[in-house]
Amino acid sequence: MINYRSTRGSKDAKTAAQAVIKGLAEDKGLFVPDAIPALPFKPEDMVGRPYKEIAKAIIAAFFTDYTDEELQACVDGAYDSKFEAEDVVPVVKAGGAYFLELYHGRTAAFKDMALSILPYLLTTAMKNENEEKKVAILTATSGDTGKAALEGFADVPGTEIIVFFPEDGVSEVQKRQMTTQEGANTHVFGIHGNFDDAQTGVKNIFNDDAFNAALNERGIRLSSANSINIGRLIPQVAYYVYAYIKLIENGAVKPGEKINITVPTGNFGNILAAYYASKMGIPVNKFICASNENKVLTDFLTTGTYSTDREFHITNSPSMDILISSNLERLLYHLSAAGLDESSAHETAGAEIAALMKSLDQNKSYTVSDKVKAGLADFAAGYADQAQTEAAIAEMYNDNNYLMDTHTAVAYKVYEDYKKATGDETPVVIASTASAYKFAASVNEALGMPAEADGFACVRALNAKTGVPVPSGLKDLDKKPVRHTGVIEKTQLADAVMESLK
């Protein structure tokens, strides 16, 4: 039985179902498994098996309190015709790399991979825990999580979903995806501020005892659809396992041979899922963490010091415009606990992480111990600026006829820089995190196309040039009526939640 504990050391352990419902631990920490299970199969034995089967086996290994029948229902509900690609996640070779295309779901971004199944995991957990309260899902988004969460939870009985996004920090297509969302239980607000303001505001609401008590009296409890929720993170592990199986299938690697994994990284959840896959038994040589000009992670992985005391940049890869990378806390916990006696590991690591997070809160920085810094050696890091991002898009399209969005282009550029610097020819999987059509204006600019009047004209122009099909969720988006018009100050999130839940 695998239980879940807080990264900040609180003693009580939760089942997976309890952790999924709660979202955030009482001491403000994030839930982590008390052990990372071994792969339940040999990857080579799963060649040719459908994505759903692999996803179910990986989730079952972590979420041991869910029954086989429950998880089958979850994966069947999640990974169905909502995904437009054959077998959910294509792996496509281009430019000497293997692109793991995670954007073929309803909202054309990788967030669909986890947020299609989270509502099923959550409602199953609520039933099993006899949770009779309504669950209000609070979500901060830098663009993609919000729409994927709205799509996943729209009209799900027993839930409300409230999303906050930076009013001037998402693409036109992303904003329209959210503000046109249908569903009687959906609530969307732009905020005057950036993603970190939204994420901090949501965390503060979770940690406001009086606010939560007031909701409790009204029969409502809060949970999260952000990757701070372990129910978001664990389903993401499956697609890295699947990628390795596909590389065996197409002869890129022999069983047991190592791969590199490159991930465009903001909140650290996606690359942490790759780390979990390696700890289960997928052979990984290097995790290559790719940032844009908000290169807080590049600097941290290089120096061991994390500092948010820096300028915030609005870039053409807005989903990575983040300075407070929440899921990094989970990695630091695992590295701190490594090698310690089982009886004291949680308490020792929890105290260390709590101290680091307190320092970040009070001093805007922290420096990790030598032990933790040594554990970061499995990670390489780099960043790409906006001009380099555009150049990578053009190079890949012109040389390989392969279309990348801006975030994937950051990853490709950082990988190319890593390969030049190291000579490392290990086969690489690059997480391709969004359809180019979500950032069509930036992609068109990269390809030297003339500017268009709006983001939707850009979509049509990009389609005319490339012939790449427009995801069905983005077609005619500009013709849908806007249903959510609220824009609030970053200090007003709690008021907006209370008003939405009346």
Model regions and ranges:
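PLP-dependent amino-acid enzyme catalytic core
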Residues: 1-502
